[in-house]
Amino acid sequence: VRPCSPPRPRRGSASHRACLIARYNFIYAKERLEAEAALRRYVCDLETVQRIIYIAVVESFRSAKMAFWKVKINVKDTLAICHRGGPSSLEVAVLDYIACHKDLYDVCCSVHEVVCSMNRNPKLPCPGEVDFVVISGLIRELCCLAFSMQTLIPPLDIAFGIDGECFNRDMYYRSFDSDFTAPFVAYHVWPALIEDGTVIVKGEVVTKK
């Protein structure tokens, strides 16, 4: 961590939050589809492709949040030396500092970690069938976005879904190829974005009987 320097003012956090939410929507609308197209060269089944991307999102957020936690500890230890306010103001100063110095995050390490984790996932095709490096661009964008979302108060996160759960219309949209009378989620296409337990952006699922 660098020597103490003035953090970015938090008054811009509302616009920063809006930009991060917009970025999440953009990744869903464009870069997710590009990743699907890249995977379809190796995997014919659309369901498998969508499962791969969903797990990539979940693993990217998990890896980025873990990396953020480690960076935050180091930054807090350093800023505490010269900080003159209370614990709450130190917390804000730490978040502002990390938001201002994004290069503290080694995103390449997270991308590698996510790819390795996916290669070991028993629900996905084995590494010999498809190399998940083909969607490393998507993984990188998700990791960077997830890391930045942790600098908000409260942070933004994704809701982790489970196959077979009851369909929640407040949290998900049904995919176009769903059985619209089915009450259960067959699999998840895209996770919902949440803030302090409240759904900010709905996810997408496939429902089948």
Region roles according to the model:
Residues V1-K209:
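Extended, amphipathic alpha-helical stalk segments that mediate dimerization
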